[in-house]
Amino acid sequence: LNTEAFRHADKPLEYSLAAIRKQGYRYCELNMLNGRDLLCEAGYYGAVSMERDPLEVKAIVDSFGLKVSAVSAHAPMAQPEISIPFLTRAIEYADALGATCVCTDEGVVPAWMSKKQAFNIIYYTLRRVLPVAERHKIHIGLEPHQKYSVKLNTYLELLNLVESPYMSCNPDTGNIFMAGQDPYEFLEAIAKRIVHVHAKDIGGVVMGDRGKVTGVPSGCACGEGVLDWQRIVKILRKAKFKGVLSVECSSEEQGRASIKHLRKVLKAK
C-alpha cells in the first residue's frame, strides 16, 4: 500500500506503517522528498526525507514487519538539474531500503519545449541516471502520469530511449484509464518489462475527467471502480510477473477494501 493513502495533518510515518500492517499488507511504498522539512520531522505527515539515514528508516519499516516494494520519486526528467540528483539519491535510498524499484515519470514538460527537445533532454537524464541504477540493481519504473507517458506510443518511445535492463515499467492502471487509454492493451504491450504495478481503480466524480487529464493522484478502492482486476491479473500472470501490486487509493478505508478484493482475485484460478 502506498503511504499516500494516509492524508493527515498530524500523523507520522509510523502511523501509516502500523495501519498498513494491520490491514494485512506485506509491502509499503514510501514517498520521498529532498531537503529537510520541519512538519515532516515533527511527525505531521509520513513522507521521508532522503537526507535521513536510510538504514534508520529501514529499521523502522522492519519493526512493523513490512518490506519496501518501491520508493515514489517523481522528478521532471526534462529538467536535469532537478531530476538527476533527485533520482540518483532515490536509487541509492531504494537500495539501502531493500526495495527493487524507483517509481517516476517524465514530469511536467515546459509548454515552450517541443517533444524533440524534451526527449533529447530526457535521454541525457536517463544516460546519467541508469548507470547508477545498474550498479545498485534498482529498476527505474516508468509510470504513465504525464502527457507523453500516458499514451502508449510515446510511453514506448520513452521506455526505449536508453537501452538498459533496469529501464522498466511501473504501470498505473488508473492513470492509463483516466488518460482515455485502454489499460488492458497498454499492459499487454509492456507486460514483459513490468517490475511493479500501481493498482489504482477509478470511479465516482473523477470519471467525467476521463480523456482530459493525465491521471489522478489516487483512486477509489480496488473492486469498487470500473477496472477489471481479473483481466489485469491474467495479463500479469501470463507475463510471469512476480512483483508487487502497490495499491493507490484515497483513504485507509479504501485500503482495507482493496486488499480484501485483490486477495479474492489473486486466489481465483
Model regions and ranges:
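Histidine-acidic metal/acid-base catalytic patches
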Residues: N2-R26, D62-F64, G98, S149-K269
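The substrate-binding groove and active-site-proximal loops of carbohydrate-active enzymes
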Residues: A5, A47-V48, S72-E81, C220-G223
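Active-site acidic/histidine proton-transfer and metal-coordination neighborhood
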Residues: Y15, R21, L55-E56, I60-K67, ...
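Conserved beta-strand positions in the central sheet of alpha/beta enzyme cores
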Residues: E29, A70, C103, G141, ...
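Glycine-rich, proline-tolerant flexible connector loops at the mouths of alpha/beta enzymes
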Residues: E29-E56, V109-S114
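Active-site loop/turn elements of alpha/beta-hydrolase fold enzymes
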Residues: L30-G35, A73, E106-G107, H145, ...
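Vicinal oxygen chelate
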Residues: L38-Y45, H74, G107, R210-P217
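Short secondary-structure transition/capping segments
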Residues: L39-G43, E81-S83, S114-Q117, N153-Y155, ...
